Swiss-Prot record:
Keyword Repeat: no
One GO biological process term: ADP-L-glycero-beta-D-manno-heptose biosynthetic process
Binding-site residues, ATP: N197, L198, K199, E200
Organism, scientific name: Coxiella burnetii (strain Dugway 5J108-111)
Protein name (Swiss-Prot/TrEMBL): Bifunctional protein HldE
Source organism superkingdom: Bacteria
Swiss-Prot/TrEMBL keywords: ATP-binding, Carbohydrate metabolism, Kinase, Multifunctional enzyme, Nucleotide-binding, Nucleotidyltransferase, Transferase
Gene: hldE
Main function: Catalyzes the ADP transfer from ATP to D-glycero-beta-D-manno-heptose 1-phosphate, yielding ADP-D-glycero-beta-D-manno-heptose.
Region entry Cytidylyltransferase, spans: 346-475
A single MF term (Gene Ontology): heptose-1-phosphate adenylyltransferase activity
Pfam families reported for this sequence: CTP_transf_like, PfkB
S-S bonds: none
Pathway connected to this protein: Nucleotide-sugar biosynthesis; ADP-L-glycero-beta-D-manno-heptose biosynthesis; ADP-L-glycero-beta-D-manno-heptose from D-glycero-beta-D-manno-heptose 7-phosphate: step 1/4; Nucleotide-sugar biosynthesis; ADP-L-glycero-beta-D-manno-heptose biosynthesis; ADP-L-glycero-beta-D-manno-heptose from D-glycero-beta-D-manno-heptose 7-phosphate: step 3/4
Keyword Disulfide bond in annotation: no
Length: 475
């Protein structure tokens, strides 16, 4: 598995964004009456705003995460492009525009009444072809110090040469992420990851009645066009991640309130790129992108998400699970805790019948660091270790009791006889067991020490034993 994502590393990432650059205008006002001229609302405009859109909004999302970005694409030689460049420069985005005299900057004007979108006017002309060797040379130069490339395709023509852009980046060993609008996915052959929404995906493969059909058709595209993965965004249904190998992964949507989905796809691909650049794998990146999407749709217009917002959301999710986490969720929480400089302590056991000796031991373990992880043998694992009459309490019951203890931050189940594999994934700063073990006997201890961690033991509180308690109960 790839190194766990430390989102503080976003600020070290350098990302190239190439695509259809737009200017988004917003006219806000009150719509309190119907026009006498036609059955349409009259909006009394009291606020006007301009924001970067399309590929420019992707670049804004990347910068909001703390990463550096170079933005490239085609605009008109007009007031809109100059206004756009001013907005982007204020956000420290390096712009490399190819200006065309006979081509307008794509502009979208949205009219809103009481913050509800009533009308959108598009000012655009699709670009068939353009020649600019200077822009291509600039792109080639930028690849030498980039960690990822985003190609933002809104089907306006800036990516007519997308095959060459993908090829040059892949030759440099860079991941290429594409937000596709074209129904011809062969154009993106060789890209690392595609992030279509469900409508865009079904426009290519046809309607999918089940998740299995969705996965099957995505996997066929992956093999046909040499993609490494496809991430399908599905609105309220969340996301589906399909990779070359392994089963598809469904991620449940996090948004409770949706104000505006404008630009949500831009946020998703920006977080995916930053996460891959920070050393994450597709699943870890998709978890964060899914979380970010849930945050951005609560905002009005094409908005962005920041690292502090992601951190807060991560902590809220951890708290909402009452300490019981899957292995994947645990690794994400640990990475975030490490980014805060926290010391991770880990222990494990069956914890079939919790007693005062356990409480004493766990409180002593927590005192060694900031976060305490308790890995718990699942029922089959306990049965193999303790016999057919154990456990007395089910895995879920044992984990719920453990989470009630103030000393414990996260509880995670494991199915093997020992948690050695899980410990190797987490690599805590301190691995702890009871005093009846020698450090050399502790599963996973060697890997922890190799990583610079410590393996420690805590004296057992005399007079307490789960096995003796069980014997008393049975007799």
């Amino acid at each position: 598995m790839a190194d766990k994502i430390d989102i503080s590393l976003y600020e070290k990432a350098r990302i190239v964004v190439y695509g259809d650059i737009m200017l988004d205008r917003y006219w806000y006002g009150q719509a309190s009456r119907i026009s006498p001229e036609a059955p349409i609302p009259v909006v009394n405009v009291d606020q006007i705003e301009a924001r970067p859109g399309g590929a420019a909004n992707v670049a804004l999302n990347v910068v909001a995460l703390g990463a550096s970005v170079e933005l490239m694409g085609v605009v008109g030689d007009d007031q809109e492009s100059r206004e756009l460049e001013t907005l982007l420069n204020k956000k420290s985005i390096n712009c490399h525009f190819h200006r065309l005299n006979d081509h307008p900057t794509v502009t979208k004007l949205r009219v809103l009444g009481q913050n509800q979108q009533l009308l959108r006017l598009d000012f655009e002309k699709t670009l068939k072809h353009y020649e600019d060797k200077g822009l291509l040379q600039r792109y080639q130069h930028s690849l030498s110090h980039a960690q990822a490339v985003i190609l933002s395709d809104y089907a306006k023509g800036a990516l007519f040469n997308v095959t060459a852009l993908i090829q040059r980046a892949r030759e440099k060993g860079l991941p290429v992420l594409v937000d596709p609008k074209s129904v011809d996915f062969s154009r993106y052959a060789g890209a690392t990851l595609l992030t279509p929404n469900l409508k865009e995906f079904e426009a290519v493969v046809g309607h999918c009645r089940t998740d299995q059909e969705l996965e099957s058709k995505a996997r066929a595209l992956i093999h046909q066009y040499r993609f490494e993965a496809i991430l399908i965004t599905r609105g309220k249904q969340g996301m589906m991640l399909i990779q070359k190998e392994g089963a598809a992964i469904n991620l449940v949507a996090h948004a409770r309130e949706v104000y505006d989905v404008t630009g949500a796809g831009d946020t998703v691909i920006a977080v995916m790129a930053a996460s891959l650049a920070a050393g994450g794998d597709f699943y870890e990146a998709a978890q964060l992108a899914n979380l970010a999407a849930g945050l951005v749709v609560r905002k009005l217009g094409a908005a962005t998400v920041t690292v502090p917002e992601l951190r807060r959301a991560l902590h809220q999710i951890t708290a909402s699970h009452h300490g019981i986490l899957s292995e994947k969720a645990l690794l994400l929480a640990v990475a975030d805790a490490r980014a805060h400089g926290e010391t991770i302590v880990m222990t494990n056991g069956c914890f079939d019948i919790l007693h005062a000796g356990h409480v004493h031991y766990l409180e002593a373990a927590k005192a060694m660091g900031h976060r305490l992880i308790v890995a718990v043998n699942d029922d089959n694992s306990v049965r193999r270790l303790k016999g057919k009459d154990r456990p007395i309490n089910s895995l879920q019951a044992r984990m719920e009791v453990l989470t009630a203890l103030r000393a414990i931050d996260w509880v995670v189940p494991f199915s093997e006889d020992t948690p050695a594999r899980l410990i190797t994934e987490v690599l805590p700063n301190i691995l702890v067991k009871g005093g009846d073990y020698q450090p050399s006997q502790i599963a996973g201890g060697d890997e922890v020490v190799k990583n610079g961690g410590k393996v420690l033991t805590i004296p057992i509180k005399e007079g307490f034993s789960t096995s003796r308690l069980v014997e008393k109960m049975l007799n």
